[in-house]
Every structure is written in structure tokens, then in C-alpha cells.
From Swiss-Prot:
Residues 529-557 are annotated as: Disordered. It comes from the Eukaryota. It comes from Arabidopsis thaliana (Mouse-ear cress). This is T-complex protein 1 subunit eta. The gene is CCT7. Belongs to the TCP-1 chaperonin family. The modification N-acetylalanine is found at A2. It is found in: Cytoplasm. Heterooligomeric complex of about 850 to 900 kDa that forms two stacked rings, 12 to 16 nm in diameter. Interacts with KNAT1. Keywords: Acetylation, ATP-binding, Chaperone, Cytoplasm, Nucleotide-binding. Residues 547-557 have a biased composition (Basic residues). Pfam families: Cpn60_TCP1.
């Protein structure tokens, strides 16, 4: 009787929304599956694009998984995990963002029937982690090294990796053209990890084929004062001076007080201001530099002064561009014009100012360090150029990863089918429920070739049956067979040069499995009402302030 009289224990604030148990887990799985369905159709060379229109009126056309996930304003807490893994895949390897979201959604979809039948989530998580370890080991075993090849052979192999990535993008029609450009750019910077050494500059207008690669640095002409017309626009082997100071005549307006005993002294004060700027300009000229760049303003006086002495100058150069010139030309950015020595000056074979479309560009080519490159992108609509830039970023990341890791695997769903077959065979050696869970993981991996077929308009069931038959061959010669997008059948992905770096697949399997396990491990969601009640209180206070307090027990005046 005493136990029945115990008062109710209230832990959470009134209005807190809690949901738990099997229904909550299934709800989270459904939300993640819905997110997977959004990006599903963007996979592969025949994938469709998404047009996203935000509240500010800007329009984005993209089929890049990470870009779409960022722009979708997802509010479901579990589904946000898929947004995070897409972002991490993009920053880590650059490509495979749609793949990682699709795999995570498919792992959860396959887990759903087991959860509904009462299987404990931890049993699934344990089996999924085991399957993930086996899958990654198999990818490493099947990967082919590109180490030890000649430079030309290596370039050819890397171009194939870049072309595989670009084939699913908006610029897929010119994938060979851009793949070669990307490989040349990555090879130019060597082993340097700084991604900003490869610049991408967009110039609206013209054709995609009008895009070109600068073996050095190119940036849009900065704002110039009167007098720049007389400056030379081309130099051979010039010395380049990089500054981070203003070269502008400025009168001291604040914190300045001058007391004169004689009016004739006034002129000497004015002359001193002029002498300071002329002294700076003289030192720049004495350094022997023919090109002067500064991150801060170079005024009209300095512009005309340099023009009279056949020196080119540009002020307000973006910090990123200035640093890239320093890396390429071998100079050092100076914060003073005193004691400028030859060692701090950069150089290049050719400097020229050139018209590109409706813009003028300053181009430094043939730089001694050769550790920078710039891709100048041309195209019609702004949205098209934006998407082309994202596509090239993905391709650059992929090639850099392939250079570093030096291993590639067959694309077109071939590696996914081979891992799936391997896991099915392995599951037969395991007794108990775990056999079913690993088998469902293996089935989920088939989503990649199946979706490639669906997006291309082929009969996925027929193609998958052919692939299963080919991969089941004991000799192992069918291990590299994947979907042939051109014929609607199957083909050897290695022979067709459909390759991708092994690190992309390893990262995708790892991230997708971790995300699926994370969502499966959540059994309760608690929604705190604090923010909502705070907004309600604020609104109520405003209402009372406008006389809304009447009828609430307040005395009328």
C-alpha cells in the first residue's frame, strides 16, 4: 500500500517532448531513408541535377551530394547526421558524397525489418562493424597500385580517375579536356598539401572549351587609378615586389596638431608629406622591380609615378592571390620598403595583362618554383560556371588523393558487387543471427550498381543478375566488372578506364557504417521546450506592453 502512495517523480520540464523505443528508432530510419531518396537520382554519369531555390532568391543547380545536403534546410535531428557525413566525405576526399549518403540510408533501410521484428539494435551494430572491417580489407586487397609508373603513364592513369569523377557532373561532356587540365594543375604543385595553390577563376561568357590552365598565377585586374593606361602590360623575366603597405598620399586629419611660429614654415610641413610618399616610391624603383603588387591601395600619384618609369603596379590585390604569387614567383611579402634586397623579390618568365572575355587578367606564367596553377573557367550562365567550379574542385581532390595513396579500384559499381559477393560468402561461415545481418549489409552495397542502372534508364534487375553471375566466377576474372552506362549491359571497368581512388571507397564505407550505427544506437529523443517557451514569453510580454494585459486580473485605470 505504501508503494502505491509514492508521489510521481517529475524529471523533465513541463512541455518536454520525449519519444522512445522501437517506434522512435523506426522514425529515425524513415527520416534518413527519405534524405537518401532526395540525392538518389544524382548518382553516376546519367544522374539528374537538382535546382535549389533559397529564401534569398539565389538559384543553385547541382548534382554534388555535399552541396545539395548543405542547401537542404534539414531539421530532423537524425537526418542531420547524413548531412555531416556528406560534408566530411567532401572535405576528406572530395568525391563520393552521394555514395556515402546512399550507403548509410540503405544500411538503415536493410536494418529496419530486423528492428521491427524485435532484434536488439546492438546485435545489428556489432555485425555491421564486422562487415565494414571485412569490406575495407577486401577493398585494400583488390586495389591496384599506380606506383612505379613513368610520369606520362601516371598522368594518363590520374586523368582516368578525374574523368570518372567528372563524368557524373554537368561538364561531363568535356571530361577528357578538363581531366587533363586538372592532372596538369595537381602535378604542378607537387607534394604541397595546400589546396589554395590551385586557383579557379570564373569568367562568364564564351564556351567551356575556352577555359585554359595557367602554369602560374592569374587574377582579375584590380581597381586602378588614372595613369595605369601608360603602364607597360607585358614583361619578360621581371622582378616582382610584393608589399603589404599603402602607397598613397594621405593628409593627417586626426591626432595631428602643428604649431608654427613663422608662416613660411607651413610649406616645409606640406613638403614633408610629399617627401614621405616620394621616398617610398623611390625605394620601390631602386629595388629594380618591374611589377609592384600590394594588398593595400596604390594611389593615383604612385600609379602615375610608376607609369613614368615603365613599372606595372596593382593595389588592393586579394591576400590569397598575393600569397599564391609569393609561392610561385619565390618572393616574400614586405611590410616596409626599407632595405629591399634581391632575395625578397620574385620573378617569372612572362608577366602580361590579358583580356579574357569581358575581364582583364594579370597573368604570371613560367614561375621558377612552379608550385601553383590557375584554371580560368569559361561558360554561359553563372549557375553553370558555379557548378563547373564545384566539379573541378571534386576532381582536383580526387587526383590529389590518388597521387598520395597511389591505389585505384574499378568503378561503375564493380567494387561494390565484389565486396557484396565476398560478404555473402563470409556470412555462410557464421552461425546464428549475425549471418542474416551481414547478408543484409552485403545486399545494401548493391544499391550503387542498381541506382546507376535506374538513373540511366536500364533494367536494374537484369543488369544486376548479369553482374552477380560474372562476380560469382571462381577464377576471379569477373571481379572488375561493373555497369556499362553506354550499352546498358556490363563491362570490365578497368579495361574501360572507369577507375576511382581506393581511399574514396574506404572512406565512404567507413563513414556510412559509422553513421548507420550511430542512428541505430539512439533509442530516445528528448526535445527541450526552452527556446519555444522563451519565444512565447517574449511575445506575451510585448502583448502586455501594448495594453494586452487587460482581462488578466489587471485593474483598469
Amino acid at each position: 500500500m505504501a508503494s502505491m502512495m509514492q508521489p510521481q517523480i517529475i524529471l523533465l520540464k513541463e512541455g518536454t517532448d520525449t519519444s522512445q523505443g522501437k517506434a522512435q528508432l523506426v522514425s529515425n530510419i524513415n527520416a534518413c531513408t527519405a534524405v537518401g531518396d532526395v540525392v538518389r537520382t544524382t548518382l553516376g554519369p546519367r544522374g539528374m541535377d537538382k535546382l535549389i531555390h533559397d529564401d534569398k532568391g539565389s538559384v543553385t543547380i547541382s548534382n554534388d551530394g555535399a552541396t545539395i545536403m548543405k542547401l537542404l534546410d534539414i531539421v530532423h535531428p537524425a537526418a542531420k547526421i547524413l548531412v555531416d557525413i556528406a560534408k566530411s566525405q567532401d572535405s576528406e576526399v572530395g568525391d563520393g558524397t552521394t555514395t556515402v549518403v546512399l550507403l548509410a540510408a540503405e544500411f538503415l533501410k536493410e536494418a529496419k525489418p530486423f528492428i521491427e521484428d524485435g532484434v536488439h539494435a546492438q546485435n545489428l551494430i556489432r555485425s555491421y562493424r564486422t562487415a565494414s572491417t571485412l569490406a575495407i580489407a577486401k577493398v585494400k586487397e583488390l586495389a591496384v597500385s599506380i606506383e612505379g609508373k613513368s610520369v606520362e603513364e601516371k598522368k594518363g592513369l590520374l586523368a582516368k580517375c578525374a574523368a570518372t569523377t567528372l563524368s557524373s557532373k554537368l561538364i561531363g561532356g568535356e571530361k577528357e579536356f578538363f581531366a587533363t587540365m586538372v592532372v596538369d594543375a595537381v602535378m604542378a604543385i607537387g607534394n604541397d598539401d595546400r589546396l589554395n595553390l590551385i586557383g579557379i577563376k570564373k569568367v562568364p561568357g564564351g564556351n567551356m572549351r575556352d577555359s585554359f590552365l595557367v602554369d602560374g598565377v592569374a587574377f582579375k585586374k584590380t581597381f586602378s587609378y588614372a595613369g595605369f593606361e601608360q603602364q607597360p602590360k607585358k614583361f619578360l623575366n621581371p622582378k616582382i615586389l610584393l608589399l603589404n603597405i599603402e602607397l598613397e598620399l594621405k593628409s593627417e586629419k586626426e591626432n595631428a596638431e602643428i604649431r608654427l611660429s613663422d608662416p613660411s614654415q607651413y610649406q616645409s610641413i606640406v613638403d614633408a608629406e610629399w617627401n614621405i610618399i616620394y621616398d617610398k616610391l623611390d625605394k620601390c624603383v631602386e629595388s629594380g622591380a618591374k611589377v609592384v603588387l600590394s594588398r593595400l591601395a596604390i594611389g593615383d600619384l604612385a600609379t602615375q609615378y610608376f607609369a613614368d618609369r615603365d613599372i606595372f603596379c596593382a593595389g588592393r590585390v586579394a591576400e590569397e592571390d598575393l600569397n599564391r604569387v609569393a609561392a610561385a614567383a619565390g618572393g616574400t611579402v614586405q611590410t616596409s620598403v626599407n632595405n629591399i634586397i634581391d632575395e625578397v623579390l620574385g620573378t617569372c618568365e612572362i608577366f602580361e595583362e590579358k583580356q579574357v572575355g569581358g575581364e582583364r587578367f594579370n597573368i604570371f606564367s613560367g614561375c621558377p618554383s612552379g608550385r601553383t596553377a590557375t584554371i580560368v573557367l569559361r561558360g554561359g550562365a553563372d549557375q553553370f560556371i558555379e557548378e563547373a567550379e564545384r566539379s573541378l574542385h571534386d576532381a582536383i581532390m580526387i587526383v590529389r588523393r590518388a597521387v598520395k595513396n597511389s591505389t585505384v579500384v574499378p568503378g561503375g559499381g564493380a567494387i561494390d558487387m565484389e565486396i557484396s559477393k565476398y560478404l555473402r560468402q563470409h556470412s555462410r561461415t557464421i552461425a546464428g543471427k549475425s549471418q542474416l545481418f551481414i547478408n543484409s549489409y552485403a545486399k545494401a552495397l548493391e544499391v550503387i550498381p542498381r541506382q546507376l542502372c535506374d538513373n540511366a534508364g536500364f533494367d536494374a534487375t537484369d543488369v544486376l543478375n548479369k553482374l552477380r553471375q560474372k562476380h560469382a566466377m571462381q577464377s576471379g576474372e569477373g571481379a572488375s566488372y561493373g555497369v556499362d552506362i553506354n550499352t546498358g549491359g556490363i563491362a570490365d571497368s578497368f579495361a574501360n578506364f572507369v577507375w576511382e581512388p581506393a581511399v574514396v571507397k574506404i572512406n565512404a564505407i567507413n563513414a556510412a557504417t559509422e553513421a548507420a550505427c550511430l542512428i541505430l544506437s539512439v533509442d530516445e529523443t528528448v526535445k527541450n521546450p526552452k527556446s519555444e517557451s522563451a519565444q512565447g514569453d517574449a511575445a506575451g510580454a510585448m502583448g502586455r506592453g501594448r495594453g494586452g494585459g487587460r482581462g488578466r486580473g489587471m485593474r483598469r485605470r
